[in-house]
């Protein structure tokens, strides 16, 4: 159909419209361990993260990203990597499939244990968020006493998600390993739906922390404004 009846188009319309499809959620199968790290970075550190990514890919004999890549997904032996370059931060997400009996004896290892330790310790920028997430194909919390090894019961909170098809647990604590933690009981949730849910949880944690960066300045400004109000009242 000819489009000559349409008004003049913005030159970036198609690019902006397609941005929603640039980083789609990945289908996931439970059980799986996921680590999500957000590094707050300036322009130089964001470029350094690209070089840091290239070093990992080179060590794993993988193709290098091009100079303009802003996101990448790759299978790297024992783990899968998802890297995303944002305006003010860089996210690194690692996922490791777990065996079906991973919770039979004790809580499973974190996904970061599959990542080269020295390389991980040198991520460019400042760590704003480090979340460890375990996804399990069950809905029975009472059958998982090992959760006590991961989450503090005195601050444990839970919420029903995905219209009641799953439950997520967290304790809103930063643990000794520097990570916050979540456990998602996903039951028999379909892989694509599970992938969308996990991406939402990771984004909630990312932007919760990013939004709170302004809190110290807001508190400081609040005391200044309170003093100014008293001055005006006098």
Show which residues each predicted segment covers:
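N-terminal pre-transmembrane cytosolic regions of membrane proteins
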Residues: 1-129, 134
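Extended alpha-helical interaction modules
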Residues: 84, 95-234
